[in-house]
Each structure stands twice: as C-alpha cells, then as structure tokens.
C-alpha cells in the first residue's frame, strides 16, 4: 500500500441531534468536534440529523401519503379531465 493516501480509519461517535441518541463505530469521516464517551475516552463527534432511532421507517411512526389525492389536485389545477 502507498503511504499517505488512505483516510484515517478510527472510532467515531455519531450523535442523532433529533433524538439525543449516540453510538460509536469505526469510520473515516472527518470532524473537528470531540466528545467524552461513557468509557471516559475522548472520541471525534459527528452529528447526524436522522438515525435509526428517529427515522419514521424504523420507529413505526410513518404516515401514508395518498397519491390519489395529489393526482386529483394536479388534474384540478391544470384542468385535465380523465376522459372517461
């Protein structure tokens, strides 16, 4: 392997800012922030907006969108008839 061309692979804390959930994993992500983890060590911190703890698919708090209503709105807006 060539020296100096590979990103630094290290342990990083990912923090979900919407649900105050954090987990530690290995990553090459770059960040300037750090946080003290539960084990007392300091790790780089990367903040994410959505994780499995806050995403509607994983939390079961999904809402179904009615595509039929959107089609009807479009047809009304542009005066398109169904031609039946």
Swiss-Prot record:
GO process terms (BP): translation
Keywords: Ribonucleoprotein, Ribosomal protein
Entry annotated with the keyword Ribosomal protein: yes
Protein family according to the UniProt entry: Belongs to the bacterial ribosomal protein bL31 family. Type B subfamily.
Self-association state and partner proteins as the record states: Part of the 50S ribosomal subunit.
Ribonucleoprotein among keywords: yes
GO cellular component: ribonucleoprotein complex; ribosome
GO MF: structural constituent of ribosome
Name by which UniProt lists this protein: Large ribosomal subunit protein bL31B
